[in-house]
Protein backbone atom coordinates (compact mmCIF):
# COMPACT_ATOMS: atom_id res chain seq x y z
CA UNK A 1 0.00 0.00 0.00
CA UNK A 2 1.09 3.59 -0.66
CA UNK A 3 0.77 6.81 1.28
CA UNK A 4 -1.93 9.22 0.12
CA UNK A 5 -0.81 12.86 0.23
CA UNK A 6 -4.02 14.43 -1.10
CA UNK A 7 -5.09 15.95 2.22
CA UNK A 8 -1.51 16.67 3.29
CA UNK A 9 -1.01 18.90 0.24
CA UNK A 10 -4.10 20.89 1.19
CA UNK A 11 -3.13 20.98 4.88
CA UNK A 12 0.33 22.36 4.08
CA UNK A 13 -0.83 25.14 1.74
CA UNK A 14 -4.35 26.30 2.60
CA UNK A 15 -4.89 29.49 4.64
CA UNK A 16 -6.75 29.27 7.94
CA UNK A 17 -9.98 30.70 6.52
CA UNK A 18 -10.22 27.72 4.12
CA UNK A 19 -9.83 25.15 6.90
CA UNK A 20 -12.84 23.63 8.73
CA UNK A 21 -13.03 21.55 11.89
CA UNK A 22 -16.53 20.09 11.36
CA UNK A 23 -18.99 19.43 8.57
CA UNK A 24 -21.40 21.84 10.31
CA UNK A 25 -18.91 24.71 10.10
CA UNK A 26 -18.07 23.93 6.48
CA UNK A 27 -21.76 23.71 5.53
CA UNK A 28 -22.61 27.07 7.13
CA UNK A 29 -19.79 28.73 5.17
CA UNK A 30 -20.66 27.08 1.87
CA UNK A 31 -24.41 27.75 2.12
CA UNK A 32 -23.78 31.44 2.77
CA UNK A 33 -21.46 31.54 -0.24
CA UNK A 34 -23.91 29.64 -2.47
CA UNK A 35 -26.66 32.15 -1.61
CA UNK A 36 -24.44 34.89 -3.07
CA UNK A 37 -24.05 33.10 -6.42
CA UNK A 38 -26.11 32.90 -9.58
CA UNK A 39 -25.77 31.45 -13.08
CA UNK A 40 -26.06 33.40 -16.32
CA UNK A 41 -25.97 32.10 -19.90
CA UNK A 42 -24.34 34.26 -22.56
CA UNK A 43 -22.42 34.14 -25.84
CA UNK A 44 -18.77 34.97 -26.38
CA UNK A 45 -19.60 38.02 -28.52
CA UNK A 46 -21.46 39.53 -25.54
CA UNK A 47 -18.40 39.38 -23.25
CA UNK A 48 -16.05 42.34 -23.04
CA UNK A 49 -12.89 42.35 -20.91
CA UNK A 50 -11.75 45.58 -19.27
CA UNK A 51 -8.90 46.77 -17.11
CA UNK A 52 -10.41 47.36 -13.71
CA UNK A 53 -9.11 48.67 -10.40
CA UNK A 54 -5.45 48.26 -9.46
CA UNK A 55 -4.11 46.42 -12.52
CA UNK A 56 -7.06 44.02 -12.28
CA UNK A 57 -9.24 42.48 -14.98
CA UNK A 58 -13.02 42.26 -15.19
CA UNK A 59 -15.72 41.30 -17.66
CA UNK A 60 -18.70 43.42 -18.67
CA UNK A 61 -21.94 42.11 -20.14
CA UNK A 62 -25.13 43.68 -21.49
CA UNK A 63 -26.05 45.12 -18.09
CA UNK A 64 -22.80 47.08 -17.85
CA UNK A 65 -21.91 45.58 -14.46
CA UNK A 66 -18.26 44.65 -13.95
CA UNK A 67 -17.40 41.18 -12.63
CA UNK A 68 -13.86 40.75 -11.32
CA UNK A 69 -11.92 37.77 -12.64
CA UNK A 70 -10.49 35.24 -10.21
CA UNK A 71 -7.26 33.38 -10.90
CA UNK A 72 -9.32 30.39 -12.04
CA UNK A 73 -11.88 32.24 -14.18
CA UNK A 74 -9.02 34.05 -15.95
CA UNK A 75 -7.69 30.61 -16.90
CA UNK A 76 -11.08 29.66 -18.33
CA UNK A 77 -11.61 32.96 -20.14
CA UNK A 78 -8.11 32.75 -21.62
CA UNK A 79 -8.95 29.26 -22.84
CA UNK A 80 -12.07 30.56 -24.58
CA UNK A 81 -9.97 33.31 -26.20
CA UNK A 82 -7.23 30.82 -27.17
CA UNK A 83 -4.71 32.90 -25.19
CA UNK A 84 -2.02 31.77 -22.69
CA UNK A 85 -3.18 32.75 -19.19
CA UNK A 86 0.30 32.52 -17.66
CA UNK A 87 1.65 35.03 -20.18
CA UNK A 88 -1.31 37.40 -19.79
CA UNK A 89 -0.69 37.63 -16.05
CA UNK A 90 2.66 39.30 -16.73
CA UNK A 91 1.15 41.98 -18.97
CA UNK A 92 -0.28 45.35 -17.89
CA UNK A 93 -4.01 44.86 -17.39
CA UNK A 94 -4.94 47.18 -20.29
CA UNK A 95 -2.82 45.14 -22.70
CA UNK A 96 -4.07 41.82 -21.27
CA UNK A 97 -7.68 42.99 -21.72
CA UNK A 98 -6.98 43.96 -25.34
CA UNK A 99 -5.42 40.55 -26.04
CA UNK A 100 -8.40 38.73 -24.53
CA UNK A 101 -10.93 40.85 -26.43
CA UNK A 102 -9.09 40.19 -29.69
CA UNK A 103 -8.97 36.46 -28.96
CA UNK A 104 -12.71 36.36 -28.21
CA UNK A 105 -13.50 38.36 -31.37
CA UNK A 106 -11.68 35.97 -33.73
CA UNK A 107 -12.66 32.73 -31.97
CA UNK A 108 -15.78 30.93 -33.24
CA UNK A 109 -18.92 32.25 -31.53
CA UNK A 110 -19.72 30.03 -28.55
CA UNK A 111 -22.19 29.87 -25.69
CA UNK A 112 -20.98 30.01 -22.10
CA UNK A 113 -22.35 29.57 -18.62
CA UNK A 114 -21.15 32.26 -16.20
CA UNK A 115 -21.09 31.57 -12.46
CA UNK A 116 -21.24 34.93 -10.67
CA UNK A 117 -20.88 35.77 -7.00
CA UNK A 118 -21.95 38.98 -5.30
CA UNK A 119 -19.15 39.32 -2.74
CA UNK A 120 -20.14 41.33 0.35
CA UNK A 121 -17.95 44.06 1.81
CA UNK A 122 -15.31 42.36 3.96
CA UNK A 123 -12.19 44.49 4.17
CA UNK A 124 -12.76 45.36 0.50
CA UNK A 125 -15.78 47.02 -1.15
CA UNK A 126 -18.68 44.81 -2.17
CA UNK A 127 -18.21 43.62 -5.74
CA UNK A 128 -19.31 41.14 -8.37
CA UNK A 129 -16.96 38.23 -9.11
CA UNK A 130 -16.82 35.80 -12.02
CA UNK A 131 -16.11 32.48 -10.35
CA UNK A 132 -16.31 30.32 -13.47
CA UNK A 133 -16.87 30.33 -17.22
CA UNK A 134 -17.97 26.90 -18.45
CA UNK A 135 -19.92 25.32 -21.29
CA UNK A 136 -23.75 25.39 -21.21
CA UNK A 137 -23.74 21.65 -20.55
CA UNK A 138 -21.87 22.02 -17.26
CA UNK A 139 -23.93 20.50 -14.42
CA UNK A 140 -22.90 22.22 -11.21
CA UNK A 141 -23.22 20.17 -8.03
CA UNK A 142 -22.84 22.61 -5.16
CA UNK A 143 -20.33 21.57 -2.53
CA UNK A 144 -22.81 22.74 0.11
CA UNK A 145 -25.25 20.06 -1.11
CA UNK A 146 -22.51 17.43 -1.06
CA UNK A 147 -21.51 18.39 2.50
CA UNK A 148 -25.17 18.32 3.57
CA UNK A 149 -25.39 14.78 2.18
CA UNK A 150 -22.29 13.70 4.09
CA UNK A 151 -23.62 15.42 7.21
CA UNK A 152 -26.83 13.39 7.03
CA UNK A 153 -24.87 10.17 6.51
CA UNK A 154 -22.57 11.03 9.42
CA UNK A 155 -25.55 11.61 11.74
CA UNK A 156 -26.61 8.00 11.10
CA UNK A 157 -23.01 6.78 11.45
CA UNK A 158 -21.49 8.96 14.22
CA UNK A 159 -18.35 6.83 14.41
CA UNK A 160 -17.14 8.67 11.29
CA UNK A 161 -15.20 11.68 12.58
CA UNK A 162 -12.80 14.38 11.42
CA UNK A 163 -9.12 13.33 11.74
CA UNK A 164 -7.05 15.02 14.44
CA UNK A 165 -4.18 16.96 12.86
CA UNK A 166 -1.71 19.70 13.74
CA UNK A 167 -2.29 23.26 12.79
CA UNK A 168 -0.27 24.03 9.68
CA UNK A 169 3.38 24.41 10.70
CA UNK A 170 2.66 23.45 14.31
CA UNK A 171 4.55 20.15 14.24
CA UNK A 172 4.36 18.36 17.55
CA UNK A 173 1.71 20.70 18.97
CA UNK A 174 -1.79 19.84 20.06
CA UNK A 175 -3.95 18.16 17.46
CA UNK A 176 -7.40 19.42 16.56
CA UNK A 177 -10.20 18.12 14.32
CA UNK A 178 -10.00 19.06 10.65
CA UNK A 179 -12.70 17.74 8.33
CA UNK A 180 -11.29 19.44 5.26
CA UNK A 181 -10.66 22.53 3.17
CA UNK A 182 -12.67 24.69 0.80
CA UNK A 183 -11.70 27.67 -1.35
CA UNK A 184 -12.84 29.42 -4.52
CA UNK A 185 -11.74 26.54 -6.76
CA UNK A 186 -12.38 23.23 -4.99
CA UNK A 187 -13.08 21.45 -1.71
CA UNK A 188 -11.48 18.44 -0.01
CA UNK A 189 -13.19 16.49 2.79
CA UNK A 190 -11.89 13.59 4.88
CA UNK A 191 -13.52 11.46 7.58
CA UNK A 192 -12.17 8.41 9.37
CA UNK A 193 -13.65 5.57 11.39
CA UNK A 194 -11.20 4.33 13.99
CA UNK A 195 -13.86 2.33 15.80
CA UNK A 196 -13.64 -0.55 13.33
CA UNK A 197 -10.28 -2.30 13.26
CA UNK A 198 -9.59 -4.35 10.13
CA UNK A 199 -6.84 -6.95 10.44
CA UNK A 200 -3.97 -6.25 8.04
CA UNK A 201 -3.33 -9.49 6.09
CA UNK A 202 0.26 -8.44 5.35
CA UNK A 203 1.12 -7.63 8.97
CA UNK A 204 -0.33 -10.06 11.53
CA UNK A 205 -1.36 -8.27 14.70
CA UNK A 206 -1.69 -4.88 12.99
CA UNK A 207 -5.01 -3.23 12.14
CA UNK A 208 -6.22 -0.88 9.43
CA UNK A 209 -8.74 1.94 9.82
CA UNK A 210 -11.42 3.12 7.40
CA UNK A 211 -11.37 6.54 5.74
CA UNK A 212 -13.44 8.61 3.30
CA UNK A 213 -11.96 11.17 0.91
CA UNK A 214 -14.25 13.45 -1.11
CA UNK A 215 -13.24 16.07 -3.68
CA UNK A 216 -15.53 18.46 -5.53
CA UNK A 217 -15.35 21.63 -7.59
CA UNK A 218 -18.20 24.00 -8.46
CA UNK A 219 -16.20 25.85 -11.10
CA UNK A 220 -15.03 23.11 -13.47
CA UNK A 221 -11.66 22.39 -11.86
CA UNK A 222 -12.38 18.80 -10.77
CA UNK A 223 -14.86 15.95 -10.91
CA UNK A 224 -17.01 14.85 -8.00
CA UNK A 225 -14.90 12.05 -6.50
CA UNK A 226 -15.59 9.89 -3.45
CA UNK A 227 -12.99 7.36 -2.29
CA UNK A 228 -13.52 4.90 0.55
CA UNK A 229 -10.51 2.99 1.73
CA UNK A 230 -8.34 1.52 4.43
CA UNK A 231 -5.19 2.96 5.89
CA UNK A 232 -2.71 2.32 8.64
CA UNK A 233 -3.39 5.73 10.20
CA UNK A 234 -3.91 9.42 9.42
CA UNK A 235 -1.07 11.33 11.05
CA UNK A 236 -0.90 14.87 12.41
CA UNK A 237 0.43 16.13 9.07
CA UNK A 238 -2.70 14.76 7.34
CA UNK A 239 -0.83 12.02 5.50
CA UNK A 240 -3.00 8.94 4.95
CA UNK A 241 -0.44 6.21 5.62
CA UNK A 242 -0.47 2.99 3.61
CA UNK A 243 -3.84 3.68 2.02
CA UNK A 244 -5.82 1.22 -0.05
CA UNK A 245 -8.95 2.07 -2.08
CA UNK A 246 -11.89 -0.24 -1.38
CA UNK A 247 -14.67 1.57 -3.26
CA UNK A 248 -14.94 4.71 -5.38
CA UNK A 249 -17.57 6.95 -6.94
CA UNK A 250 -16.64 9.48 -9.62
CA UNK A 251 -18.69 11.62 -11.99
CA UNK A 252 -18.05 14.50 -14.39
CA UNK A 253 -20.00 17.71 -13.92
CA UNK A 254 -21.74 17.36 -17.26
CA UNK A 255 -25.22 16.47 -18.47
CA UNK A 256 -28.22 15.18 -16.54
CA UNK A 257 -26.71 11.94 -15.25
CA UNK A 258 -24.76 13.53 -12.41
CA UNK A 259 -27.84 15.53 -11.34
CA UNK A 260 -29.87 12.32 -11.11
CA UNK A 261 -27.31 10.02 -9.56
CA UNK A 262 -24.80 11.86 -7.35
CA UNK A 263 -27.01 11.96 -4.23
CA UNK A 264 -27.95 8.28 -4.41
CA UNK A 265 -24.48 7.18 -5.54
CA UNK A 266 -22.65 8.75 -2.62
CA UNK A 267 -25.19 7.39 -0.15
CA UNK A 268 -25.08 3.88 -1.57
CA UNK A 269 -21.28 3.64 -1.56
CA UNK A 270 -21.07 5.13 1.94
CA UNK A 271 -23.79 2.95 3.46
CA UNK A 272 -22.58 -0.25 1.80
CA UNK A 273 -19.10 0.40 3.19
CA UNK A 274 -20.29 1.44 6.64
CA UNK A 275 -22.51 -1.63 6.94
CA UNK A 276 -19.69 -4.02 5.99
CA UNK A 277 -18.61 -5.65 9.22
CA UNK A 278 -14.99 -5.75 10.31
CA UNK A 279 -15.13 -9.54 10.21
CA UNK A 280 -16.38 -9.56 6.60
CA UNK A 281 -13.80 -7.01 5.49
CA UNK A 282 -10.97 -8.83 7.25
CA UNK A 283 -12.02 -12.08 5.58
CA UNK A 284 -12.08 -10.34 2.20
CA UNK A 285 -8.56 -8.99 2.63
CA UNK A 286 -7.21 -12.28 3.97
CA UNK A 287 -8.64 -14.07 0.94
CA UNK A 288 -6.97 -11.56 -1.39
CA UNK A 289 -3.68 -12.04 0.46
CA UNK A 290 -3.56 -15.77 -0.30
CA UNK A 291 -5.44 -15.89 -3.62
CA UNK A 292 -3.05 -16.87 -6.42
CA UNK A 293 -3.82 -15.26 -9.77
CA UNK A 294 -1.27 -17.27 -11.72
CA UNK A 295 2.14 -18.96 -11.50
CA UNK A 296 3.96 -16.05 -13.18
CA UNK A 297 3.68 -12.61 -14.71
CA UNK A 298 2.25 -13.65 -18.12
CA UNK A 299 -0.47 -15.74 -16.47
CA UNK A 300 -1.41 -12.98 -14.01
CA UNK A 301 -1.63 -10.42 -16.82
CA UNK A 302 -3.72 -12.78 -18.93
CA UNK A 303 -6.11 -13.65 -16.08
CA UNK A 304 -6.84 -10.04 -15.16
CA UNK A 305 -6.92 -8.71 -18.73
CA UNK A 306 -9.50 -11.32 -19.78
CA UNK A 307 -11.77 -10.04 -17.02
CA UNK A 308 -11.23 -6.45 -18.17
CA UNK A 309 -9.69 -5.41 -14.85
CA UNK A 310 -7.18 -3.08 -16.54
CA UNK A 311 -4.94 -2.83 -19.60
CA UNK A 312 -2.07 -5.28 -20.04
CA UNK A 313 0.39 -2.43 -19.57
CA UNK A 314 -1.23 -1.37 -16.29
CA UNK A 315 -1.36 -4.93 -14.96
CA UNK A 316 2.25 -5.54 -15.93
CA UNK A 317 3.35 -2.30 -14.28
CA UNK A 318 1.37 -3.21 -11.14
CA UNK A 319 3.05 -6.63 -11.09
CA UNK A 320 6.50 -5.01 -11.28
CA UNK A 321 5.59 -2.44 -8.64
CA UNK A 322 4.40 -5.10 -6.21
CA UNK A 323 7.56 -7.13 -6.75
CA UNK A 324 9.72 -4.05 -6.24
CA UNK A 325 8.11 -3.38 -2.87
CA UNK A 326 8.39 -6.91 -1.49
CA UNK A 327 4.81 -7.98 -2.17
CA UNK A 328 3.88 -11.24 -3.82
CA UNK A 329 2.80 -10.05 -7.30
CA UNK A 330 1.14 -13.38 -8.07
CA UNK A 331 -1.55 -12.76 -5.43
CA UNK A 332 -4.61 -10.54 -5.61
CA UNK A 333 -3.33 -8.53 -2.63
CA UNK A 334 0.02 -7.98 -4.32
CA UNK A 335 -1.64 -6.64 -7.49
CA UNK A 336 -3.93 -4.45 -5.37
CA UNK A 337 -0.80 -3.03 -3.76
CA UNK A 338 0.84 -2.45 -7.15
CA UNK A 339 -2.21 -0.76 -8.66
CA UNK A 340 -2.54 1.50 -5.63
CA UNK A 341 1.08 2.62 -5.92
CA UNK A 342 0.63 3.30 -9.64
CA UNK A 343 -2.45 5.39 -8.85
CA UNK A 344 -0.54 7.47 -6.32
CA UNK A 345 2.23 8.11 -8.86
CA UNK A 346 -0.02 9.14 -11.76
CA UNK A 347 -0.33 12.90 -12.44
CA UNK A 348 -3.66 12.36 -14.25
CA UNK A 349 -6.94 12.32 -12.30
CA UNK A 350 -8.77 10.07 -14.79
CA UNK A 351 -5.96 7.51 -14.72
CA UNK A 352 -5.89 7.52 -10.90
CA UNK A 353 -9.63 6.85 -10.84
CA UNK A 354 -9.29 3.97 -13.33
CA UNK A 355 -6.45 2.40 -11.34
CA UNK A 356 -8.32 2.70 -8.04
CA UNK A 357 -11.37 1.07 -9.60
CA UNK A 358 -9.19 -1.70 -11.02
CA UNK A 359 -7.72 -2.35 -7.56
CA UNK A 360 -11.22 -2.52 -6.10
CA UNK A 361 -12.27 -5.07 -8.74
CA UNK A 362 -9.21 -7.22 -8.00
CA UNK A 363 -10.36 -7.50 -4.38
CA UNK A 364 -13.67 -8.90 -5.67
CA UNK A 365 -11.92 -11.15 -8.23
What name fits each language-model region?
Residues 140-365:
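Intrinsic disorder/low-complexity polar-acidic segments
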Residues 1-149, 171:
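Feature for intrinsically disordered/low-complexity regulatory segments and propeptides
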